[in-house]
Amino acid sequence: MLGKEDGANSIGKSSAMLAIDFVFGGDTYLKSDGVKHIRHHTIFFAFQFCGQKYCFARATEDADNAFLCKENHDLMGPYRMKDEFVNWLKVQYHMDFDGLSFRIALSSFFRIYSKDNTDERRPLRGIPRKDMEKSIALLVALFDRNKDIQV
């Protein structure tokens, strides 16, 4: 998502990206302007895997859970604990790599203004305040190349 180069239009790009991160199990959105201004709310979203659509809801006031719902947004339960939901996503996206959590793999490369990982001089540094070695190890694991490295 890109805005104008001069940054003149603040159209909520960061809030939208934080909401997307929230859908994937992140929590930074809970402290965002979106929640501060419109208070607690529920985000409804869907994923499609192998031709099957899965609809969910995640509420800011109950962020530890993700609820299964119908396409019309009716909650149908059962709910999943956030960690269980994130693990389900990891399996669906085939991202079960040694030494790499799904959340770290995903959120490390979301470049969102308020997430403190927007260092344009070090674009491979996916983990703020960590050395480049950890960021490179993350990329190696993300591309499932650990087995190719000889020690």
Per-range role (PLM):
Residues 45-46, 52-68:
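Gly/Lys-enriched N-terminal cap/neck module of very large, oligomeric protein machines
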